[in-house]
UniProtKB/Swiss-Prot annotation:
Component of the ESCRT-I complex, a regulator of vesicular trafficking process. Binds to ubiquitinated cargo proteins and is required for the sorting of endocytic ubiquitinated cargos into multivesicular bodies (MVBs). Mediates the association between the ESCRT-0 and ESCRT-I complex. Required for completion of cytokinesis; the function requires CEP55. May be involved in cell growth and differentiation. Acts as a negative growth regulator. Required for the exosomal release of SDCBP, CD63 and syndecan. A motif (PTAP/PSAP motif) lies at residues 321-324. Residues 200-215 have a biased composition (Polar residues). This is Tumor susceptibility gene 101 protein. It comes from the Eukaryota. Ubiquitous. Higher expression in brain and mammary gland. Lower expression in liver and tumoral tissues. The keyword ATP-binding does not apply. Residues 159-163 are annotated as: Interaction with CEP55. Residues 237-317 form a coiled coil.
Length: 391
């Protein structure tokens, strides 16, 4: 039964970056259906334990034209994705771990991708895809060979083969100090049935030429040549492994430096574009400032000129009609309004007792007669000009 996103959030309730971890986990289980999230207790080297979520199941690996289901278990720390997952190969009872530069005798997986893990560049889905590619070149497990009971047990003619676990470069830890590598008592993880795995062949291991001095002497002691050859072989293997580790680390660091260089080049280009754009904007602003100053000077000059002209100009000469008929209408209208004002002030003078009633009536009759004539003449002029009636 598929695990829903809400169930994952409940399982990862104590994770510091729960939503981000859930999102990456959902992407993984959507692509690799055999991987299932399980909440279990993880025991560290110091004996402490912690409830963590692991992805357990199989991933499809193509090896020599066939697809094999490789069982793995990925433990997600509660600080994921800022710390890498702890990865293991978990063989079934019919499988045996093949130790190498990427897998040790306990099944723990070592990859340069894990060593150089850095969020957000590194993520879980990409890690699994890298595992598939690497396991396709060097399978981490193989089928356990069956030994027929009819054959007598094989007696080695030389010293037993020494297995060397892949080590990390000195001074470098693949994981933070708060999360030490998993002890041999790592909790087991159930897996779905897996397909057949490639059986071991002599081509998987380097053949050793026969040496006449190999094996114990007749008196039961091991010869010095045998010990020396064994030590030389062990040291050579260890030196090759260390050299490979150093080369992988240097290549990873070189790739990181190249990415940093590309980012710096892109940033430099963006900064140059920003500086160019700012220079253009500054030039445009300076141009607008000069234009505004010029217009301000023109307005100030025009205003000063108009003020000087207003002091010397007659108000009657300022307004000049476009035609003689319009000038006549303007004069008639002004004169008629002047008579209207005169009659008003005569009434005020009568009210205040400044003039007598006879004087008032005499002047009002004269002004009213003239006003009537002005209005009649103005009406005629407006009609001639095609204007509407005013009264």
């Amino acid at each position: 039964m598929a695990v829903s996103e809400s169930q994952l959030k409940k399982m990862m309730s104590k994770y510091k970056y729960r939503d981000l971890t859930v999102r990456q986990t959902v992407n993984v289980i959507a692509m690799y259906k055999d991987l299932k999230p399980v909440l279990d207790s993880y025991v560290f080297n110091d004996g402490s334990s912690r409830e963590l979520v692991n992805l357990t199941g199989t991933i499809p690996v193509r090896y020599r034209g066939n697809i094999y289901n490789i069982p793995i278990c990925l433990w997600l720390l509660d600080t994921y994705p800022y710390n890498p997952p702890i990865c293991f190969v978990k063989p079934t009872s019919s499988m045996t771990i093949k130790t190498g530069k990427h897998v040790d005798a306990n099944g723990k997986i070592y990859l340069p991708y894990l060593h150089d893990w850095k969020h957000p560049r590194s993520e879980l889905l990409e890690l699994i895809q890298i595992m598939i590619v690497i396991f396709g070149e060097e399978p981490p497990v193989f089928s356990r060979p069956t030994v027929s009971a009819s054959y007598p047990p094989y007696t080695a003619t030389g010293p037993p083969n020494t297995s060397y676990m892949p080590g990390m470069p000195s001074g470098i830890s693949a994981y933070p100090s708060g999360y030490p590598p998993n002890p041999s008592g790592y909790p087991g993880c159930p897996y779905p049935p897996a397909g057949p795995y490639p059986a071991t062949t002599s081509s998987q291991y380097p053949s050793q030429p026969p040496v006449t001095t190999v094996g114990p002497s007749r008196d039961g002691t091991i010869s010095e040549d045998t010990i020396r050859a064994s030590l030389i072989s062990a040291v050579s293997d260890k030196l090759r492994w260390r050299m490979k580790e150093e080369m992988d680390g240097a290549q990873a660091e070189l790739n990181a430096l190249k990415r940093t260089e590309e980012d710096l080049k892109k940033g430099h280009q963006k900064l140059e574009e920003m500086v160019t754009r700012l220079d253009q904007e500054v030039a445009e602003v300076d141009k607008n400032i000069e234009l505004l100053k010029k217009k301000d000077e023109e307005l100030s000059s025009a205003l000063e000129k108009m003020e000087n002209q207003s002091e010397n100009n007659d108000i009657d000469e300022v307004i000049i009609p476009t035609a003689p008929l319009y000038k006549q209408i303007l004069n008639l209208y002004a004169e008629e309004n002047a008579i209207e004002d005169t009659i008003f002030y005569l009434g005020e003078a009568l009210r205040r007792g400044v003039i007598d009633l006879d004087v008032f009536l005499k002047h009002v009759r004269l002004l009213s007669r003239k006003q009537f004539q002005l209005r009649a003449l103005m009406q005629k002029a407006r009609k001639t000009a095609g204007l509407s009636d005013l009264y």
